Amino acid sequence: MMITLILFTVGMATTTLLIPSNKLWAGAIFQSALLSLLSLIVLNNHWTASWHNLSSILASDTISAPLIILSCWLAPIALIASKGQLNNSSDLGSRVFIIMIIVITGALIITFSSLELILFYIVVETTLIPTLILITRWGAQMERCQAGLYFMFYTLFGSLPLLIAIIAIYISSSSLSIPNVNLLWANDGSIESLTMWWALSINCFFNNLPVYGFHLWLPKAHVEAPVAGSMILAAILLKIGGYGLMRLIALFSTISMNALSLALIVFCTWGALITSVICVRQTDLKALIAYSSVGHMSIVAAAIFSETSWGMNGALMLMVAHGLVSSALFSLANTVYERSGTRTLAITRGLKLLLPLSTLWWLLMCAANLGLPPSPNLIGEILILSSLISWSVWLFPIVGFAQVFGAIYSLMIFQLSQQGTPFTSIINVFSSFSREHLFAALHILPLILIMINPFSALIAWLK
């Protein structure tokens, strides 16, 4: 059945070339909405801890199913939010833009359902090409070329050690199937080979998350990318690193309880704290949201390295919740940029008086971003905090201060953008469009559904 989703994306790309120009945007949204519905139907019964083999190389389980659904769910939302870019593009440019989003969605479906390490690596690298095109072609400023260079350098060259590790695994185990490799190396792998695999592979995953210290490409890419690129990058592409760590963590189990693992947990939690402090100092709205993603993903990486059931469940919950919240924040920031022409918080103040209904969406998303009850972010952060304290109680001050600063910059986003007197240059802005309320509502709807029944996936995992 996973082949159905992949073939559907191929059909979407083909149909995009044939749709009349006056129906291109609506047709693309309709097709991507059908893909979202199809993913919910196909993956409805896959919330169990075991693999659901759909072919010899594709499968889904508790880890991959929510991320696949999230990828399909955000595709139509990204197109809805990209109406401004499509209006300013030619007919050919609009078709290429839509096809790039479809290609990224299809590649993500294969990535999250891949059973082969080499297929996983190839498809992850494939997602870089359309993302680079979105950044360099539809970026807002001339710095987009430099942002694309940073993006390719960090993600492409950072993942080359993973290819070396995959070759070493194949030589050692004669198999690249993820379940087989987990069994073979977890039982028969030497400490030296496992340590080498650890050192080589986490560099790739740290770049993709990214954690603090490997993050220099992310703010540049987010600031220069179009709204669809920022939404997909923050919501899905950053989760590939966390997914890879969660999927292959069994390879690390024999050396997990040592100083290296604890050092990485301390490194990730300390990075989350430093990033939260950096967020408080930001004046650019998109850069602030981008740095907040680095902080959240650093906490996710620390939880995965704890290798506890609570840590894994909290990491998965926070990845899904952060994907929805960060995507919504970037789309709302784009609505401000389209009206004011700037992302500086000092200029975009007083929006509550100009766009009163949008203030509600800003309030809900900022509250979810800081982990206000009963948001899924809070549930994930509680599980992660519990797992980290079980490793060392001395991690509590670091994570605690990171959460405090996270609350500060989340409230700062809302206060600086919505409160105060509007700047004179943005007083005569046009009112909100219905499509803007639509994509904001489509972001908050899954969060509400997770709030209603947050533990269904976690109970299935524990079983």
UniProtKB/Swiss-Prot annotation:
KW Nucleus (keyword) present: no
InterPro entries: NADH4_N, NADH_Q_OxRdtase_chainM/4, NADH_UbQ_OxRdtase, ND/Mrp_TM
A Pfam family this chain is assigned to: Proton_antipo_M
Enzyme Commission number(s) from the entry: 7.1.1.2
Topology with respect to the bilayer: Multi-pass membrane protein
Record keyword NAD present: yes
Catalytic activity: a ubiquinone + NADH + 5 H(+)(in) = a ubiquinol + NAD(+) + 4 H(+)(out)
Any single biological process term in GO: ATP synthesis coupled electron transport
GO molecular function list: NADH dehydrogenase (ubiquinone) activity; ubiquinone binding
Cellular component terms (Gene Ontology): mitochondrial membrane; respiratory chain complex I
UniProt family annotation: Belongs to the complex I subunit 4 family.
Function: Core subunit of the mitochondrial membrane respiratory chain NADH dehydrogenase (Complex I) that is believed to belong to the minimal assembly required for catalysis. Complex I functions in the transfer of electrons from NADH to the respiratory chain. The immediate electron acceptor for the enzyme is believed to be ubiquinone.
Protein name, per record: NADH-ubiquinone oxidoreductase chain 4
Lineage: Eukaryota, Metazoa, Echinodermata, Eleutherozoa, Echinozoa
Gene: ND4
